[in-house]
Curated annotation (Swiss-Prot):
Organism: Vibrio campbellii (strain ATCC BAA-1116)
InterPro entries to which the protein is assigned, alphabetical: ATP-NAD_kinase_N, ATP-NAD_kinase_PpnK-typ_C, NAD/diacylglycerol_kinase_sf, NADK
Gene: nadK
The protein's name: NAD kinase
Residue numbers annotated as active site: 74 (proton acceptor)
GO cellular component: cytoplasm
List of residues binding NAD(+): 74-75, 148-149, 159, 176, 178, 189-194, 249
GO molecular function (one): NAD binding
Amino acid sequence: MKNPCNVIAIIGKPRDQQAIQTHRELYEWLTSEGYQVFIDDRLAAILDEIPQSQFASLVELGKNADLAIVVGGDGNMLGAARILSRFDVAVIGVNRGNLGFLTDLNPDDFKEALKAVLKGKYIEEERFLLEAEIHRHGQIKSHNAALNEAVLHPGQVAHMIEFEVYIDDSFAFSLRADGLIVSTPTGSTAYSLSGGGPILSPSLNAISLVPMFPHTLSSRPLVVDGKRRIKLIVSPENRGTQEVSCDGQVSLPVSPGDEIHIYQSPNVLKLIHPKDYSYYHVLRNKLGWSSKLF
């Protein structure tokens, strides 16, 4: 994070009154502390008591802010991350969602933790994203980024699809399955975990491939080096349309015969945590693991 931190962005979608109140409290407290504060312009109509000059788009916030505070759950963080990762801005989260693997701060007691962060007492880590491209007849038809995962799956009707998997242009395996989850370490505690994938430490430079309901007894999740390029070739015999879903928020249409290229993005999310942050404490707390015996 840039030091000193002068410009702070508050980001989040209109969700419920408690979340809106947290945006309001953050703005009032940070401005009283002397910081220049701007807010996600999606909140302009709701926070109408705040001057319109203090609202800006996510791109503008990413360009100008030293620190971005995302209010909400992991979904809000994922949506913000795909844009903020393009810029040199640190990001921290206030949890107003459910599990909150990426949003550390308690909404009812954020001031002390934020004071320490703003004084330079924090842990910073970089989380890599994936880029997903749909290739058709040698041309890129669509693309997007994902912090958690890129998922190949059928369109609106659930059915089995066939595809081949290549790693660095070397054939790895073919599958008849409901799809494939290609996950980052950040996403290994999300959809990938539900599909039986491994939990990867966030600092690992690795990508996991998790088949979804494969029609075989031998298929298992596979972990590959994070610098490998994944190519999926969709069978031209598949019926209907398929999709690639990025973080469960953006869908890229896929036609039979298309190629899907998935690789590590050059952009990273600069995620910061309070000094007392422990990834394994988060896992134990969120996943309900047993406590120490002695």
